[in-house]
């Protein structure tokens, strides 16, 4: 598949275009090239993330989808899904493209359900942990990450009571 075929299918935004041209370089080299071109940081960061996520596992497993989305943010994850879909369509790999459409539908379901994807959306905050007697520092971060991981796997666990009962061992 040639670059032209990829570019024809993709949206006009620069992030998609640069991603299509530079994805084979990997994230580190893509970011270096874009910095040399003196592009804005937003374009550089988003293109780097798009390239980094290229080739992600295609899945119908909601917990894995939540983990993938959590790793880059919901807005970026939507961009990645669109990029991957157009990439596979340009490569005439309809099976992967259709699987990505299913994955996108599941992701929309996740968003509609209001599932927690970030620490900010977690029912417990760092201040809650401090009030519970945990000393500020790495331990709070580790506990919050553990809680988020649990909630990404099982969204129903995103309640203060459940998270305190199952993650705080004071």
Model-identified regions with their sequence ranges:
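C-terminal subdomains that position terminal phosphate/3'-OH groups for nucleotidyl transfer/ligation
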Residues: 4-170
């Amino acid at each position: 598949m040639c670059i032209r075929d990829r570019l024809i299918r993709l949206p006009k935004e620069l992030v998609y275009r640069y991603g299509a041209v530079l994805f084979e370089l990997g994230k580190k080299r893509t970011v270096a090239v874009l910095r040399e071109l003196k592009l804005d940081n937003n374009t550089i960061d988003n293109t780097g993330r798009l390239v980094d996520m290229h080739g992600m596992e295609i899945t119908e497993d909601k917990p894995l989808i939540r983990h993938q989305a959590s790793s880059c943010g919901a807005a970026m994850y939507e961009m990645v899904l669109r990029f991957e879909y157009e990439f596979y369509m340009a490569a005439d790999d309809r099976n992967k493209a259709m699987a990505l459409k299913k994955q996108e539908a599941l992701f929309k379901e996740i968003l509609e359900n209001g599932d927690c994807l970030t620490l900010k959306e977690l029912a417990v905050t760092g201040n809650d942990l401090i009030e519970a007697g945990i000393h500020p520092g790495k331990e709070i971060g580790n506990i919050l990450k553990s809680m988020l991981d649990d909630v990404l796997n099982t969204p129903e666990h995103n309640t203060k009571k459940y998270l305190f009962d199952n993650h705080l061992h004071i």
